Amino acid sequence: EKLGQGQQPRQWLQPRQGQQGYYPTSPQQSGQGQQLGQGQQGYYPTSPQQSGQGQQGYDSPYHVSAEHQAASLKVAKAQQLAAQLPAMCRLEGGDALLASQ
């Protein structure tokens, strides 16, 4: 009987190994949270791409008048504002912004 009781604690050690199997799941869940962060990184590149379009406006207009340069800059700024506004609407609530406008 004493030997049998000695073997039982060994069985208690095995559930600890099973708990180690549970711990990796929580880092995996936090890893899914990091994937959400990657999704946010997918939103940020849109604004640099828009600014990149503005830079394309800088490169090409050497053969174009300064008025067209100014117009292209206004369009680029308007695109950036339009990209920022939907994010603000989602954060603060579209109804409040629509009412203020």
From Swiss-Prot:
Provide ranges: composition bias, Low complexity: 41-62
Please, what other remarks does the record include? Glutenins are coded by several genes on each of the group 1 chromosomes of wheat.
Q: Name one GO molecular function term.
A: nutrient reservoir activity
Q: Which organism is it from?
A: Triticum aestivum (Wheat)
Its name, as the record gives it, is Glutenin, high molecular weight subunit PC256
Q: What Pfam families does the record tag this protein with?
A: Glutenin_hmw (PF03157)
Compositional bias (Polar residues) spans?
A: 1-27
Residue ranges of the region described as Disordered: 1-65
The entry describes its oligomerization and partners as: Disulfide-bridge linked aggregates.
- UniProt entry keywords in alphabetical sequence: Disulfide bond, Repeat, Seed storage protein, Storage protein
Q: Does the keyword Repeat apply?
A: yes
Q: In its keyword annotation, does this UniProt entry include Lipid metabolism?
A: no
